[in-house]
């Protein structure tokens, strides 16, 4: 069996085998919601603590809850900046402009979204409707397959390039000795 046929066979086996009946046991998300800053509808118990037969519903955010957590983060940031500006030793006071008509520079930085805030568009949808769909793949599976294909193509390209040069080099060496 030649090297290229072995590589093709390995590629086909590597792409087909992982997709046969393997589903993630517990879907995980890249983004996690901070339970202390987000408003939830109910206290949902941890799935590990409930009985294995009972399925819990996923946390679904509405626009009101998302904006509510944003306003909570804004008020928390405002309270922190008030506490920081109340210290007379470290705060020299607001900067006033020497030119007339120019407003004073504010020391409060614009509010950026917190690290733990998850916008509603990133929430994973329940897998119930997609479980029976054979063409459905989650992001982690697609990422792994993409990396596998890229690695195989990269190695194949290196083999093709080096084998061609080695062939040319060996012919060059054989012709030189004649």
Curated annotation (Swiss-Prot):
N-terminal signal peptide: 1-21
Task: Recall the GO molecular function terms of this protein's record.
Answer: ion channel regulator activity; potassium channel regulator activity; sodium channel regulator activity
Ranges of Polar residues compositional bias?
Answer: 21-59, 80-100
Chain spans, region Disordered: 21-130
| KW Transmembrane (keyword) present | yes
Which tissues express it? Answer: Expressed mainly in epithelial tissue, such as lung, intestine and kidney. Not detected in brain, liver, muscle, and heart.
Q: Which UniProt keywords apply?
A: Cell membrane, Glycoprotein, Ion transport, Membrane, Potassium, Potassium transport, Signal, Sodium, Sodium transport, Sodium/potassium transport, Transmembrane, Transmembrane helix, Transport
One GO cellular component this record assigns the protein to is:
basolateral plasma membrane
The organism's place on the tree of life at top rank: Eukaryota
Q: How is the polypeptide modified once translated?
A: Glycosylated.
Q: Does the keyword Transport apply?
A: yes
Which Pfam family, an example, fits this chain? ATP1G1_PLM_MAT8
Q: Where in the cell is it found?
A: Cell membrane; Basolateral cell membrane
Name the membrane topology term: Single-pass type I membrane protein
Assembly: Regulatory subunit of the sodium/potassium-transporting ATPase which is composed of a catalytic alpha subunit, a non-catalytic beta subunit and an additional regulatory subunit. The regulatory subunit, a member of the FXYD protein family, modulates the enzymatic activity in a tissue- and isoform-specific way by changing affinities of the Na+/K+-ATPase toward Na(+), K(+) or ATP.
Q: Spell out the family assignment given in the record's similarity comment.
A: Belongs to the FXYD family.
What is the role of this chain?
Associates with and regulates the activity of the sodium/potassium-transporting ATPase (NKA) which catalyzes the hydrolysis of ATP coupled with the exchange of Na(+) and K(+) ions across the plasma membrane. May increase NKA activity by increasing the apparent affinity for Na(+). Involved in down-regulation of E-cadherin which results in reduced cell adhesion. Promotes metastasis.
The protein depicted here goes by the name: FXYD domain-containing ion transport regulator 5
Species for this entry? Mus musculus
């Amino acid at each position: 069996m030649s090297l290229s046929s072995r590589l093709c066979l390995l590629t086909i086996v590597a792409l087909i085998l992982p997709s046969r009946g393997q589903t993630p046991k517990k879907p995980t998300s890249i983004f996690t919601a901070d339970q202390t800053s987000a408003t939830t509808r109910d206290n949902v118990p941890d799935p590990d603590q409930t009985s294995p037969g009972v399925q819990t519903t996923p946390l679904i955010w509405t626009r009101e809850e998302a904006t509510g957590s944003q306003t909570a983060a804004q008020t928390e940031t405002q309270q922190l900046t008030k506490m920081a500006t109340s210290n007379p030793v470290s705060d020299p006071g607001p900067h006033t402009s020497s030119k007339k008509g120019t407003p004073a520079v504010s020391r409060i930085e614009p509010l950026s979204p917190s690290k733990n805030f998850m916008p509603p568009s990133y929430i994973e949808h329940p897998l119930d409707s997609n479980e029976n769909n054979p063409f459905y793949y989650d992001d982690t599976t697609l990422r792994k397959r993409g990396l596998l294909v890229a690695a195989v193509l990269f190695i194949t390209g290196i083999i093709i390039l080096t084998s061609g040069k080695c062939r040319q080099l060996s012919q060059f060496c054989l012709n030189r000795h004649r």
